[in-house]
Design a protein with these regions (language model features):
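Fungal secretory targeting signals
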Residues: 1-17
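N-terminal leader/targeting pre-sequences
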Residues: 18-210
């Protein structure tokens, strides 16, 4: 009877594959995260923009309370298993493309404003690329943003995302970005003329459901 447990364990271990996989699968298989964007996920109203930032990051068009906005969106972020590429696909409704100012991936838990790690505005005119409400792109390590200064804000803030929350090292690779996604601390944020500081709508990224 004493041999039963060791034998069972040995059989279980023997059943596991000990063979390495084809390395090419790293570029063709993916870890997928998704977000449904809505104004309700923004942590504040435009009227609550801090006074010190109203000139640089305040609205330049009349704002609407979150519960009255019609903007909605869905975004997918796919990481190749070898973490050399990531792919973003976004679809939005209820937003005038001409009103779009910025679109980012930030890091931060739900209800918290966090620094920018991917600035989609650096990759083309957002009003044009989102004109039909759909947009997709490929990301590499080179697309990760290290923002040292924003006009009107203290020099050095914000500086990308931490490789680990509460840790000083910054995110510089897709591997670090995927690690943050796994923890549920990445979010899409769309900024418009009417909703600039907090944003028009936001979507926290979580592992995609089958």
């Amino acid at each position: 009877m004493r041999l039963a447990l060791p034998l069972t364990l040995a059989f279980a271990l023997g059943a596991l594959s000990s063979h390495a996989k084809d390395p090419a699968l790293g570029a063709t298989t993916f870890t997928v995260y998704e977000a449904f964007l809505s104004p309700a996920q923004e942590p504040g109203e435009e009227s609550e923009t801090p006074k010190l930032l109203q000139k640089s990051l305040g609205a330049t068009a009349p704002s609407t309370p979150r519960e009255q906005r019609k903007s909605r969106g869905h975004g997918v972020l796919r990481f190749s298993k070898d973490l050399t590429r990531a792919y973003v696909e976004v679809e939005m409704t209820g937003v005038n493309p001409d009103d779009i100012l910025m679109f980012h991936i930030h890091c931060g838990p739900p209800g918290v404003l966090g620094p920018v790690v991917v600035d989609f505005g650096e990759l083309g005119n957002l009003s044009k690329t989102l004109a039909n409400g759909r947009w997709s792109m490929e990301l590499t390590n080179a697309n990760l943003t290290f923002i040292k200064d924003i006009k009107g804000m203290k020099s050095g803030l914000p500086e990308s995302c931490p490789a680990e929350l509460g840790f000083l090292a910054q995110t510089r690779t897709l591997a670090s970005l995927e690690s943050l996604a796994r923890k549920g601390v990445l979010y899409f944020n769309l900024h418009t003329k009417a909703h600039t500081y907090y944003g028009e709508m936001r979507g926290q990224l979580y592992a995609a459901q089958p």
